[in-house]
Structures are given as structure tokens and as C-alpha cells.
């Protein structure tokens, strides 16, 4: 490390005080050579503390020149001044200024973290310094577990951590008893003997007498500058300890990772120190994240349920009805939609299945029981087109259509109505449909509520049977068409429209496209989900504002800590990073708890409503964590920036 000659020329420091100006230092000229031990004396208000703050780059002169190791400090920015404090100066404060959350060892290590030393390097050096100062057995103790003398020794070890060549001691014995004070002065004598430049600010003449040179101030002016001994100043040569302090060459990212690790550690300590406040801060994030994740899960489940219900109408299907359009009051009088149309459509290459449908209502009877039901006349491909499954028996086939058979397939509701107490089941039994006796050959599985389901009883007969035995005409209620997977239902709809218009010579039919219904309802579901999620996002924003508020409080509470870190060499970016990471950690942990709450809500909902199952997608969870991190960055930046722009001297003064 380059030896630091301190040169002050015409240095002046003024402070505004209302409408007046207070002059703390007046046109000071001073030179301190490397290796000197200097005492700066003066009464309260003489300017000695102001001089020490300027010498340690904690404050700037109003005018004049201050050079350290040949560098003019007036031209340096905040980070360059931090580098000077980190590399050239070691501070010993009257009030110690140790961080209460950290052990003695960790307090000593702080300057080395900002200097880029590796964890092993700084741990070894810190232990060595504590051993040299006789408090190695207190390395794991926190400041409140140490005596005043022990705390001051930790402060001295911290000042020596980076091998500083200038030690600035502000009333180092002022808060100590006589015995502890003598030990501290002995240590300062040893540092001077090692070649350090030692500058002691004191009002005690007996302390000043230990120095080789005494500078007296009064009203900001040097009134005396005298040597107390004829002994020559120590030769300013780098000592082994100083050489050891130089960090070995490391990649920049390694130093950056160390500083980030320190920031994470301090964030966790700060959060643990105020558990209730931290939890209440997280609560807004927890509620917001849980709401968003849960609502997205509900929206996805609703969409799946709707799509499953629409699938009950048949996937990739279109249905053709008589009439100019849906709801045409004259549709019942249009008799042009016939079985021949269905047979012609079946020959088209883009058609996978076609079934004519007719329907009527009738009374079902079995033994003493009777009930009204919907009688559906369908083709043999109907069940495949609709995706209907059996719980028992079989479907009728093309032979049943041709033979106008009286084989009937009943639904689950019909089975429960007429055969719930029959141990043999309904298969093979005779069911009277109106006046037509029918043999039950199959039972369909029960459909959940939704599209394609009905509270009415339903039975299925060949459409030929219904036309001949119930309706007495050949016209159809509709033709249900399943389109090949290679063809879109929209394209098939256009082709079917052209085909039937040519056959009928007029467009006297309307086509219902289930995919259009699917898209409409899906879009509606997504819109509703988005609207509800937007409301939930508001709670996230409120939570983010809470994070900002608490971080501002945290900054105001930890001004002293910020000042200490800046005094030992922390850059503005280090302070910004520390408080930003703390805000992000609060939001990330809140986000994790929010996801856990959403899981709990989903599990409870699934247990209470088994027919409507919620599932949390990985995408929504990842989005939740990204969102919570973003909230931490956005709402934590302002408090973190405020912390990083604090004046180090003002921060130390407010501790």
C-alpha cells in the first residue's frame, strides 16, 4: 500500500446555521508525514473533530486543498473517497460503532469484505488481529457481551483489517476506565512503532503526551504545533501485518459474490431482529401472491371444466338444424332436412361420422313405475360422434337401424329411476316407451353437469324406430357431423353450407359449430380470470407499498450501521445492494408463503368440491416468484437508493 503523506493547504470548513455561517476550520495549513504519531487537541468546538472527519474523507472541506498520497480529494467522487477510506484509513471511534447483530469476528471482517478478500483470507486475518489484541476468546461474542475495553479492541482490529497506514482515533479512551484506556494507548504506541501514521483526537493532555507531535486548535485555527520528544518519527515501512492485508488476486465476480453473500446475511439478520414487523410486511405479499395463484388455478379449472362439458357435445363436431338461423320460429315447418342429406354428407372426404337425430318426449313405464323422458332417435354413429361411454351393455348398430329395432339404450338417471333396487340390472329387461315395448341393451355413463347434460331422463332408440313408431314423418331434428382431425370445423362448416345449399337450392338450415362455442366460452373464462386476477394484483401493489414503507423505516433505524459501513469503505453500490436484497428477500419469502397458502386453499377446495379439481401450474408459481422479485426490486429501490446516498458523517452522527 502506498504511504500516505497528508497535506492541507488553506483548508476551510463552513456550516450554515440559519441565516448565519459557522466557520469550523479557518485557512488551515498542515502536513503530516508517514509514520508520525500526532495528537490533535482542543476544547469542545475548536474544530478538532471536524478536522478528523475531513482527514478520514468522511467530510469535504468548503475550500482549500486536501491531498492524501498525492491525490486531491476535492476531485474524487463518493466511491473514490470510499476507496481511500477502505485502503488508507482505519477508524477508532469513541463509541466503538460496532454492529450489534454481528459477532466480534464478523465486525472485524467487514472492511475486508468490501476490499475483496476471500472468506478464508479475511477469517484468518481477523482471528490473527483479535489474537494480537488479546481477545481471541471473545471472537464469537456480540458487542453487548463485551466490556468497553474489549469493544474498543474489536474496533482497533477492524481499523487494522485492511492494513491501513493511517489510524484515526477519535477520543479512543473517552468511554473507558483508566486501565482499559491505558491498554488502548499501549496498542496505539505499538501501531506507531510498526510504522503506522497515528492521529489521535483528544482533549486529554495526558493522552496527547503519548504522541510525538501535538497540534492544538482553537476556533478552527492552529494555535500550536509542537514536538513532545526529540525522538525521530518512525520510519514508514510496510510491516508484515500490512503486507498480509493485501488481498491476493481474485476474479472480480468472486469479490462481488462475497459482498452479495454479506448482503444476504445482513438481510436475514435484519428480518430476524424484527420478526413481527417483517411478517406483517410480508402479509400483503402473501395475500396478493396467494390470490393470484389461486385465482389462476380456479380459472384454469373452470376452463378445463367448460371444455370437458363442451366435449360432451362431441369434439370437432358441427350440428345442422332446419331454419334460417338459430331460434327461427318457422323451423318446425321446414321439412327439407332428411336422412338422404345425412347419407350424402357421409360420402364427403372431410367427414368422419354422421348421425341423423330426431326427438320427442314420452312416458316410460316399468312395472308400477312411470316417468316422463326425452326419447332420442339417433344413428349408429351417434355415440362415437358424441364420445358417449357405456357403463353396461352395448350400443345398437346399423342392423338395428335397418330393422327398425326396438332396442333401447338408457341413461344412468333412467336406470336409477326404474332399476336402482334390481340386483340383476336393467340389461335385457323390457321398458315401455309410450306404447312401444323396448328391450334395454345398454346403459350410458352419467354425465357431470354442463353442456350436453340434462336433469330429464333420456333414452336412445334408432332414429328409424322413432320416425316410424313415434313421429310418423321422415324429417330430422338435426344432423350431427364429426369432422376429420385434419380439417378445421370452420372449413368443414363452409363446405357443408355450400353442399347442402346446392342440394336444397336454398339455404334453409343453420349450422351450430361447437368449436365456436368453445372459443367464446374459453375467451369469456379467460377474461373473467384476468379481471379477478387484476383485482388480486392490486393487493400485490398494496403489499409492495408496505414493503417500501417498512424499508424506509428500516433505513432510518439503521442509519448508524450505514455510516459504519461507509466509514470502513463500503461503496454506494454496496449499500444499495444490501437494502435492495433485503427488500427482495422479504418479497421472495412472502411469495413462497403465498404459494404455500394457495396450495392449502386448493387442497381444501378439492376436498370440499371433488367434481371441480384445482391444480397449481408450474407456470403460475414461477410467475408468482418473478412477480414477487419484481415487487421487491421496484418498491425496494427507492429506500435502498436513499440509504446509499446518505452522507457517511451525518449517518455516524445520528447513531
From Swiss-Prot:
Q: Which GO terms describe its biological process?
A: response to antibiotic
Disulfide linkages recorded for this protein, renumbered to the chain, are: none
UniProt keywords, alphabetically: Antibiotic resistance, ATP-binding, Cell inner membrane, Cell membrane, Membrane, Nucleotide-binding, Translocase, Transmembrane, Transmembrane helix, Transport
Report the membrane topology from the UniProt record: Multi-pass membrane protein
Q: Which enzyme class, named as a word? A: translocase
Q: Where is the ABC transporter domain?
A: 6-244
Recorded GO MF terms? ATP binding; ATP hydrolysis activity; transmembrane transporter activity
Tell where it localizes.
Cell inner membrane
Q: Known SUPFAM superfamilies for this protein?
A: P-loop containing nucleoside triphosphate hydrolases (SSF52540)
First and last residue of the signal peptide: none
A GO cellular component annotated for this chain's UniProt record is: plasma membrane
Q: What is its EC number?
A: 7.6.2.-
The superkingdom listed in its UniProt entry is Bacteria
- What is one Pfam family matched by this protein? FtsX
Q: Where does ATP bind?
A: 42-49
Q: List the InterPro entries hit by this protein, alphabetically.
A: AAA+_ATPase (IPR003593), ABC3_permease_C (IPR003838), ABC_transporter-like_ATP-bd (IPR003439), ABC_transporter-like_CS (IPR017871), MacB-like_ATP-bd (IPR017911), MacB_PCD (IPR025857), Macrolide_Exporter_MacB (IPR050250), P-loop_NTPase (IPR027417)
Q: What is its main location?
A: membrane
Can you tell me where the transmembrane regions are?
Answer: 279-299, 528-548, 579-599, 618-638
Q: How does it assemble?
A: Homodimer.
Query: Its family?
Result: Belongs to the ABC transporter superfamily. Macrolide exporter (TC 3.A.1.122) family.
Give a short account of what the protein does: Non-canonical ABC transporter that contains transmembrane domains (TMD), which form a pore in the inner membrane, and an ATP-binding domain (NBD), which is responsible for energy generation. Confers resistance against macrolides.
Its name, as the record gives it, is: Macrolide export ATP-binding/permease protein MacB
Read off the lineage from the record. Answer: Bacteria, Pseudomonadati, Pseudomonadota, Alphaproteobacteria, Hyphomicrobiales
Amino acid at each position: 500500500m502506498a504511504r500516505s503523506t497528508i497535506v492541507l493547504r488553506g483548508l476551510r470548513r463552513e456550516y450554515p446555521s440559519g441565516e448565519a455561517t459557522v466557520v469550523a476550520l479557518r485557512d488551515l495549513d498542515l502536513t503530516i508525514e508517514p509514520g508520525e504519531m500526532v495528537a490533535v487537541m482542543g476544547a469542545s468546538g475548536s474544530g478538532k473533530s471536524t478536522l478528523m472527519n475531513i482527514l478520514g474523507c468522511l467530510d469535504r472541506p468548503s475550500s482549500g486543498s486536501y491531498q492524501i498520497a498525492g491525490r486531491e480529494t476535492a476531485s474524487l467522487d463518493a466511491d473514490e473517497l470510499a476507496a481511500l477510506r477502505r485502503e488508507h484509513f482505519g477508524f477508532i471511534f469513541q463509541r466503538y460503532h460496532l454492529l450489534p447483530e454481528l459477532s466480534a469476528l464478523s465486525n472485524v471482517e467487514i472492511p475486508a469484505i468490501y476490499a475483496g478478500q476471500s472468506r478464508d483470507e479475511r477469517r484468518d486475518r481477523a482471528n490473527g488481529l483479535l489474537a494480537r489484541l488479546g481477545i481471541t476468546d471473545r471472537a464469537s461474542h456480540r458487542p453487548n457481551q463485551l466490556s468497553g475495553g474489549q469493544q474498543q479492541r474489536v474496533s482497533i482490529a477492524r481499523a487494522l483489517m485492511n492494513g491501513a497506514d493511517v489510524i484515526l482515533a477519535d477520543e479512543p479512551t473517552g468511554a473507558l476506565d483508566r486501565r482499559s484506556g491505558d491498554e488502548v494507548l499501549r496498542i496505539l504506541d505499538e501501531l506507531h512503532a510498526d510504522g503506522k501514521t497515528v492521529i489521535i483526537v483528544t482533549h486529554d493532555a495526558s493522552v496527547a503526551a503519548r504522541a510525538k507531535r501535538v497540534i492544538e486548535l482553537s476556533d478552527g485555527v492552529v494555535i500550536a504545533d509542537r514536538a513532545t520528544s526529540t525522538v525521530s518519527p518512525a520510519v514508514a515501512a510496510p510491516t508484515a501485518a500490512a503486507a498480509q492485508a493485501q488481498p491476493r488476486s481474485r476474479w472480480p465476480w468472486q469479490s462481488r459474490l462475497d459482498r452479495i453473500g454479506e448482503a444476504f446475511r445482513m438481510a436475514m439478520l435484519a428480518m430476524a431482529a424484527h420478526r413481527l414487523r417483517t411478517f406483517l410486511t410480508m402479509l400483503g405479499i402473501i395475500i396478493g401472491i396467494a390470490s393470484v395463484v389461486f385465482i389462476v388455478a380456479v380459472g384454469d379449472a373452470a376452463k378445463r371444466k367448460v371444455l370437458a362439458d363442451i366435449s360432451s357435445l362431441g369434439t370437432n363436431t358441427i350440428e345442422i338444424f332446419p331454419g334460417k338461423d338459430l331460434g327461427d320460429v318457422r323451423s318446425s315447418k321446414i321439412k327439407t332436412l332428411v336422412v338422404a342429406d345425412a347419407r350424402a354428407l357421409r360420402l364427403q372426404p372431410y367427414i368422419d361420422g354422421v348421425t341423423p337425430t330426431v326427438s320427442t318426449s314420452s312416458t316410460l313405464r316399468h312395472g308400477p313405475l312411470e316417468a316422463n323422458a326425452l326419447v332420442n332417435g339417433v344413428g349408429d354413429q351417434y355415440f362415437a360422434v358424441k364420445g358417449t361411454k357405456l357403463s353396461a351393455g352395448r350400443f345398437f348398430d346399423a342392423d338395428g337401424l335397418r330393422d327398425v329395432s326396438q332396442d333401447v339404450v338408457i341413461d344412468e338417471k333412467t336406470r336409477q329411476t326404474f332399476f336402482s333396487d334390481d340386483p340383476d340390472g336393467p340389461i335385457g329387461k323390457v321398458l315401455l316407451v309410450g306404447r312401444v315395448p323396448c328391450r334395454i341393451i345398454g346403459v350410458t355413463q352419467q354425465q357431470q353437469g354442463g353442456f350436453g347434460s340434462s336433469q330429464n331422463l333420456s333414452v336412445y332408440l334408432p332414429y328409424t324406430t322413432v320416425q316410424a313408431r313415434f313421429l310418423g314423418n321422415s324429417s330430422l331434428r338435426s344432423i350431427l357431423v364429426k369432422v376429420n382431425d385434419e380439417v378445421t370445423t370452420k372449413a368443414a362448416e363452409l363446405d357443408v353450407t355450400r353442399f347442402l345449399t346446392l342440394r336444397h337450392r336454398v339455404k334453409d338450415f343453420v349450422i351450430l359449430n361447437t368449436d365456436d362455442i368453445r372459443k367464446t366460452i374459453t375467451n369469456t373464462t379467460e377474461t373473467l380470470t384476468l379481471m379477478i386476477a387484476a383485482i388480486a394484483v392490486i393487493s400485490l401493489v398494496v403489499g409492495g407499498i408496505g414493503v417500501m414503507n417498512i424499508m424506509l423505516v428500516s433505513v432510518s433505524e439503521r442509519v448508524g450501521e450505514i455510516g459504519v459501513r461507509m466509514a470502513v469503505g463500503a461503496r454506494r453500490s454496496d449499500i444499495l445492494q444490501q437494502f435492495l436484497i433485503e427488500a427482495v428477500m422479504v418479497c421472495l419469502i412472502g411469495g413462497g408463503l403465498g404459494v404455500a397458502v394457495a396450495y392449502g386453499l386448493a387442497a381444501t377446495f378439492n376436498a370440499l368440491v371433488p367434481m371441480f379439481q384445482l391444480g397449481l401450474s408450474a407456470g403460475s408459481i414461477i410467475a408468482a416468484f418473478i412477480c414477487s422479485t419484481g415487487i421487491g426490486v421496484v418498491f425496494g429501490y427507492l429506500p435502498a437508493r436513499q440509504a446509499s446516498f446518505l452522507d457517511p458523517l451525518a449517518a455516524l452522527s445520528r447513531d
